[in-house]
Each structure stands twice: as C-alpha cells, then as structure tokens.
Regions:
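Short glycine-enriched loops at secondary-structure junctions
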Residues: 23-24, 73-76
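Short, solvent-exposed polar/charged micro-motifs at secondary-structure junctions
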Residues: 27-28, 47-48, 77-78, 112-114
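Conserved short-loop catalytic and cofactor-binding motifs
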Residues: 38-42, 75, 89, 97
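Catalytic pocket-lining loop regions of alpha/beta-barrel enzymes
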Residues: 1-67
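Divalent metal-coordination and catalytic microenvironments
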Residues: 20, 36, 71, 101, ...
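Mid-to-C-terminal alpha-helical segments outside catalytic/metal-binding sites
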Residues: 62-65, 79-116
C-alpha cells in the first residue's frame, strides 16, 4: 500500500481504482485520493468484522470513493445473480441512503472515468 500512496502523491490527478478494498489493510486506505471497489471481498469483510463494523469501515474510506464491481468470474464459483443478490443483501443491511447507494452502484464510477 505504501507504493500506491507514493504514486498518488507523485501523480495527484491520476484516477486509480483499488480492487477488493485493498484487502484487509483497512487503516492504510483512509485518506487516499483513490476509488475503492469492493468486488468479491464485501462478504469476507462482513464475515470478519460484522455488518456494523463493515459499514463503519466503508464510511471511513468515504462513500464518495466506493465503487461497486462484480469481479466476475468470482472465485467462489457462484452464478452472477447469486453474487449480486449477496452484495445487495449486505448493502441493504447497512445504513446507506438511496442517494449514497446510487453513488456507490453507478455515479462514483462515472466520476472516476469522466476524464479518461
């Protein structure tokens, strides 16, 4: 993660999406000028930290920096519908507003690629 921080400091205008929320290096993510997708790892976060703490972690990273991604084909060999259903089941248990959910699932990605 240190290398990513150095790249972002050297090139502050680069648009970077960090996959899987950067793994479980949660503390290293706070304050980075990057986007974070939570493909595949969201259920793992919930299993490890629970819904409440996962929600807190996502909010500390910043709702405006979160991007939904499918990570298909998922290594868990689930069908796409099962993957999406699980993600949205988890997201529905969190306290995101409708606007925040729309940003995570669509608008943040559009902002991320806007200048490409």
């Amino acid at each position: 993660m240190r290398n990513l921080k150095n790249v972002l400091k050297k090139y502050p205008n680069v648009r970077l999406s960090i996959a899987h929320l950067g793994g479980f290096q949660v503390e290293d993510l706070y304050g980075l000028n990057a986007y974070f997708n939570f493909s595949a790892i969201l259920p793992d976060y919930v299993n490890r930290f629970g819904i409440k703490r996962t929600n807190e972690i996502l909010r500390l990273i910043g709702v405006d920096k979160l991007v939904f991604a499918t990570d298909f084909p998922d290594s868990r060999c689930l069908k796409p519908k099962e993957i999406y259903d699980k993600y949205f089941e988890i997201l529905n248990e969190m306290d995101f507003s409708l606007e925040e959910a729309e940003n995570i699932c669509r608008n943040n990605a559009l902002k991320m690629i806007d200048k490409i």
